[in-house]
């Protein structure tokens, strides 16, 4: 699922102050009349500390030469996660908020939104073990951000389930819920053209960057054999590594593993030449 807004180039961003960059960090998603989700997103967008964490997460990714981890990445994951959850619900797959707590789909939407919004805030501190850092940052802010949305004990239930989605998105994470699986898979789907190829265009020619540059488009549709069908269009078969090493790994072992079908194919008759040569130093 492509995003209309792309990350701001580093040289362009450097012309602005940190305050200006943080001020523009506002996320949007189709709430479909979910007033709880509306209130939660409004609270997050109004929270300068959260938006500063997004700014600092991107700073860390730039220092390491990684793909975009700014608020744009957050917005992509937010929208993808909501789409996945709604497609699963349409097929009769109930989230934990419904099956375990007797709540509603709209509450599950708040949980996956929270997971998407906070899953990488720990990157503002350090890349290594950032999921754990995200946990303690989110644990401090979530209750306050949810204060106008839920009363106790619902507020703590929503916050706890959100924290489960955050820790579950790490590479060897074990999400116990549909919501956790949704956030984990959504995080791997920010790979459309202009997104994961950033390290490649920066001169990094390893297999991760090369395979990322091979991904042109990602489509998330209602499936026929399974509730969700993810179609990935590639310009080069090197993209298979990105699909299998990143996406398939994120999907395996989650409660939605058997609910999602992944199909990747190279478009056209010929493959795009991604680099002229490769030299091992």
Identify the role of each PLM range.
Residues 2-45, 63-68, 79-106, 118, ...:
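Divalent metal-dependent phosphate-bond-processing catalytic cores, especially two-metal-ion Mg2+/Mn2+ enzymes
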Residues 45-56:
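N-terminal glycine-rich anion-binding loops that anchor highly charged ligand groups
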Residues 56-76:
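N-terminal low-complexity or amphipathic/hydrophobic leaders
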Residues 111-115:
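Active-site alpha-helix of zinc metalloproteases
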Residues 122:
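Catalytic acidic motif of RecA-like/P-loop NTPases
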Residues 127-140:
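Post-HEXXH active-site segment of zinc metalloproteases
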Residues 151-159:
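Membrane-interface starts of transmembrane alpha-helices
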Residues 158-161, 167-170:
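An acidic, phosphate/nucleotide-engaging active-site surface
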């Amino acid at each position: 699922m492509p995003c209309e807004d792309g990350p701001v180039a580093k040289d362009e961003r450097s012309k602005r102050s940190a305050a200006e960059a943080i001020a523009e960090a506002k996320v949007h998603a189709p709430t479909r009349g979910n007033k709880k989700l509306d209130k939660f997103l409004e609270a997050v967008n109004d929270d300068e500390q959260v938006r500063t964490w997004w700014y600092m997460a991107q700073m860390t990714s730039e220092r390491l030469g990684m793909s975009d981890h700014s608020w744009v990445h957050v917005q992509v994951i937010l929208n993808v996660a909501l789409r996945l959850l709604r497609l699963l619900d349409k097929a009769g797959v109930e989230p934990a908020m419904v099956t375990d707590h007797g709540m509603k789909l709209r509450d599950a939407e708040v949980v996956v939104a929270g997971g998407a919004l906070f899953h990488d805030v720990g990157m503002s501190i350090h890349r290594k073990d950032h999921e754990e850092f995200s946990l303690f940052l989110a644990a401090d802010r979530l209750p306050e951000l949810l204060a106008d949305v839920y009363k106790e004990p619902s507020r703590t239930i929503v916050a706890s389930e959100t924290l489960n989605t955050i820790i579950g998105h790490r590479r060897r994470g074990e999400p116990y819920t549909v919501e956790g699986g949704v956030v984990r898979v959504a995080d791997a789907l920010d790979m459309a053209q202009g997104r994961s190829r950033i390290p490649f265009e920066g001169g990094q020619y390893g297999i991760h960057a090369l395979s990322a540059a091979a991904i042109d488009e990602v489509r998330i549709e209602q499936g026929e054999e399974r509730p969700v069908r993810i179609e990935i269009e590639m310009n080069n078969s090197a993209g298979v590594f990105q699909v299998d090493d990143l996406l398939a790994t994120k999907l395996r072992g989650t409660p939605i593993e058997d609910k999602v079908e992944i199909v990747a194919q190279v478009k056209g008759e010929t493959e795009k030449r991604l680099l002229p040569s490769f030299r091992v130093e």
